[in-house]
């Protein structure tokens, strides 16, 4: 009985995450500004990590956890890169002055 309830909850969470992924991909394509697309990309990567985690629980394996870490690292690096691109490539020094 408990296994059936757990299985139903896992399947329903996959459906909800799938709907969230479709909404995020729509906003990623439609987003009017680059900042909207960056936020949507971060949200999409979080949803994908959640889907992979739920699939890991469903299959009863921990081998997918490495791919979750890889998605998180790629998401972080891309967010920092795009943020730097939006900022014009400037970085801050200790005096709060911008340098190239």
UniProtKB/Swiss-Prot annotation:
InterPro entries membership: MrpF/PhaF-like
Membrane-traversing stretches: 5-25, 38-60, 70-92
Family of the protein in this entry: Belongs to the CPA3 antiporters (TC 2.A.63) subunit F family.
Subunit structure: May form a heterooligomeric complex that consists of seven subunits: mnhA2, mnhB2, mnhC2, mnhD2, mnhE2, mnhF2 and mnhG2.
Location of the protein in the cell: Cell membrane
Protein name: Putative antiporter subunit mnhF2
NCBIfam families per the UniProt record, alphabetical: PRK12657.1 (NF009300)
MF terms (GO), sorted A to Z: sodium:proton antiporter activity
Assigned GO CC terms: plasma membrane
